[in-house]
From Swiss-Prot:
It holds the Pfam family Queuosine_synth. One of its GO terms (cellular component) is cytoplasm. It comes from Sodalis glossinidius (strain morsitans). It catalyses: 7-aminomethyl-7-carbaguanosine(34) in tRNA + S-adenosyl-L-methionine = epoxyqueuosine(34) in tRNA + adenine + L-methionine + 2 H(+). SUPFAM superfamilies: QueA-like. This is S-adenosylmethionine:tRNA ribosyltransferase-isomerase. Its main location: cytoplasm. Transfers and isomerizes the ribose moiety from AdoMet to the 7-aminomethyl group of 7-deazaguanine (preQ1-tRNA) to give epoxyqueuosine (oQ-tRNA).
Length: 353
């Protein structure tokens, strides 16, 4: 299929720049993957959609304040977006500058240029930086970094984003973008779901900046997916297998949970096996899902790998029809926007656009 097949018109005013005042107050567009039927709901209607014994799988990563501004000692402004923390002193980062720093270049980062760093080496598009600071990397970023809001939010980050651009259950720092489907869950909703008997499990996938990179090929099969670190521990495997055995559904909260679970399924000969490592799994039309039965997700960018994943799950025609309806009904799009509840379309893998 062509990347252009996943384009759709989106008025600028439907891009959410700020979240709802209450996390769980967003709208929810439910899509029956098998029939294409749509229902307009609110997010707390999950209580009716989910049955006792269903398993919600969350991504418990936390967003780090990964953006730093500064300058090269030799002159010239610089912007650093940390992609991956290597150890207490080193990171891999995207660097924006009029002229890329060379190995050995000294940098002064932070709003007051107080953080000394050195460009150690270049690894393809990423720069290895070493911080010459008494603090470890995560403490340093927490003290001086900016929240890495997506480009389409198109405003500077503010103090409130440090809380709002995090899930309430995130506990593993390492992402440069939020697993946004999880932003809609607040403590009262989680408590109500537990009281109903809905099971919960947590994977980890540290979202990289590659999630915002455009697909630069014409045919989606030619796209090279970025790599991200994921963990699916044994207790998640056990919870998934128990859920399947009792005839309930595995409900992935977000595309990152999908990619984690399906990576674990692809890694072993069994249906699912523990997984700890990098994944570059690219899910698009034709993919045979092995684990996930239901997907909760936000509305994604045109021509993005994320809308391709949704299309592989619900079916291309059903997905594009749902997006057209969402635009017509003025749903809010992208990270701070509204959500979808999608049941898997077993016929989706046979579609070809």
């Amino acid at each position: 299929m062509r990347v252009a097949d996943f384009s759709f018109a989106l008025p600028d005013n439907l891009i959410a720049r700020y979240p709802q005042a209450q996390r769980s107050a967003c709208r929810l567009l439910s899509l029956d993957g098998q029939t294409g039927a749509l229902a307009h709901q609110v997010f707390t209607d999950l209580l009716e959609e989910l049955a006792p014994g269903d398993l919600l799988v969350f991504n418990n990563t936390r967003v780090i304040p990964a953006r730093l501004f500064g300058r090269k000692v030799s002159g010239g402004k610089i912007e650093v977006l940390v992609e991956r923390v290597l150890d207490d002193k080193r990171v891999l980062a995207h660097v924006r500058a009029s002229k890329a720093p060379k190995p050995g270049s000294a940098l002064l980062l932070g709003d007051d240029d107080s953080i000394a760093a050195t460009m150690v080496a270049r690894h393809d598009a990423l720069f290895e930086l070493r911080f010459d600071d008494a603090r470890d990397v995560l403490t340093l970023l927490n003290d001086a970094g900016h929240m890495p809001l997506p480009p389409y939010i198109d405003r500077p980050d503010d103090v409130a984003d440090r809380e709002l651009y995090q899930t309430v259950y995130g506990e593993r720092p390492g992402s440069v973008a939020a697993p946004t489907a999880g932003l809609h869950f607040d403590e009262p909703l989680l408590a109500a779901l537990r009281a109903k008997g809905v099971e919960m499990a947590f994977v980890t996938l540290h979202v990289g900046a590659g999630t915002f990179q455009p697909v630069r090929v014409d045919q989606i099969e030619h796209h090279q997916m970025h790599s991200e670190y994921a963990e699916v521990p044994q207790e998640v495997v056990d919870a998934v297998l128990a859920c399947k055995a009792r005839g309930n559904r595995v409900v992935a909260v977000g595309t990152t949970a999908v990619r984690s679970l399906e990576s674990a399924a692809a890694a072993g000969e069994q249906a699912l096996t523990p997984f700890f490592g990098d994944t570059s799994i690219f899910i698009y039309t034709g993919y045979q899902f092995r684990v996930v039965d239901v997907l909760i997700t936000n509305f994604h960018l045109p021509e993005s790998t994320l809308i391709m994943l949704v299309s592989a799950f619900a079916g291309y025609r059903h997905t594009l029809a749902a997006y057209r309806e969402a635009v017509a009904q003025a749903y809010r799009f992208f990270s701070y926007g509204d959500a979808m509840f999608i049941t898997r379309n077993p016929a989706a893998a046979a579609e070809r656009g």
